[in-house]
Amino acid sequence: MSTSTDWPSLASLLARQPDFDPDAVPVAQARELLADWVTPRVQARSMPAQAEAVGRVLARDVIARLDLPPCDNAAMDGYALCHADLNPEGDTTLPVGGRTLAGDPPATLPPGQAWRIMTGAPMPAGADTVVMQEHVRRHADDSALQGASSQPDGGACPSETITLPAGQKPGQNVRRRGEDIRTGQTALPAGRILSPMDLGVAASQGIVDLPVFDPLKVGVFSTGNELVQSGQPLAAGQIHDSNRPTLLALARSRGFEAIDLGWLPDDPAILTKALASSIDQVDVLLTTGGAAGGDADLLWHVLSQPMHHQGMSLPTEAHAWKLKLRPGRPLVIGRISQTPVFGLPGNPVAALLSFLFVIDAALQKMAGITTPRPLPRIRARAGTAIRKRPGRQELLRVTLCYHESDDLPVALPAGSQSSAQLRSVAEADGIAVLPEDQGPVAQGDRLDVVPLHGLL
């Protein structure tokens, strides 16, 4: 849906990669190349800085209008004073001249006195230090202060004195004006995924509306004669389509607008027409199936031919990669006019993991995210030996067991590791990442695991 025309072909980017081999693409290289290739595809708009903005991507820098804190204030309940009035060798006794609460106007500290102050209250003029109330001895109750507020004229309260020990540090327990945010600085950078804390920062600046990007529109097709939508009867040789619901939900969980484009048979004419007509509805297209290069795998062939839609010729681009990844080896990358197309494997687990480990960074960049969120990782111990040969990255579905006697969880395979076994992902706690150069894993070896809780 973007109107941008300044987008180089993937072929031109690959031409600058002398070591690139489309039949043996490392996962990290694939992820970086795709993120470098795509451009932001979303439009900006203004929306209230309320809870609905959480998860949206900030379109422009938010520049601070106010210092935060707006003035020097107390970080603790206690007594404000001038550090120069203290005896460095022993106890100091000072009369208390008044009291300031949070929200009161600033007072003025008379020389040689202390000032009762509460957390968040503005520091009196002439005071530079706060002593915690737990560190002083009070020599009279504060009944004379009940109901009193800040006294800008420095009016004394002779009924109370305090004694405090030596060792107080100048400036202690004081929050300085602007130490959190300074007027004119970038309070929130563009390209940031807004969090509840970010809304708090905006509110502290008196900001009512925020510039945000529209969610990236991710369209999802399933392809394959063997697929039938859930709820429909199955004929011999058919299966229910699990990929499309999974990818739509995954796209939505990543903050994108997921658009269900339905199912397509293995028919080049139907596939071509559906792909060409969909680019007006979405920012990026995902398909599952038809990526492996078999006789019935048509996506690369369709994307290799020019398309036409509503009387217009649509330029296309197509690349077929074999990733050094298990599961998830085949990947088709293409473009119809200015709309990128990612052809994911047909096996359910391979499609899911290809989304997360290969194309997610590119989708985030298209959504306007300046620094894509990496997948979180934790360390775990292998609960059993794992057979592996160097040469490709392997992703294992694992359950995690926690023991008080061990500082790391134990990772055990979660059922079958077949790329068609979706249930094993549903039962898994995480994905163990075995690097490309990794050989056999011994029981007890440390592993990197991407936890799935909160991710799927």
Where are these regions (language model features)?
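Short, low-complexity N-terminal leaders and the immediately following helix N-cap/first helix
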Residues: 1-91, 116, 146, 151-153, ...
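Short, conserved secondary-structure segments in the cores of folded domains
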Residues: 58, 70-71, 105, 113, ...
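Helix-rich terminal scaffold detector
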Residues: 1-28, 210-344, 348-354
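Solvent-exposed alpha-helices and their adjacent loops that cap or buttress functional pockets
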Residues: 72-74, 86-89, 106-110, 123-124, ...
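Conserved active-site and cofactor/substrate-binding residues in soluble primary-metabolism enzymes
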Residues: 22-29, 45-48, 52, 76, ...
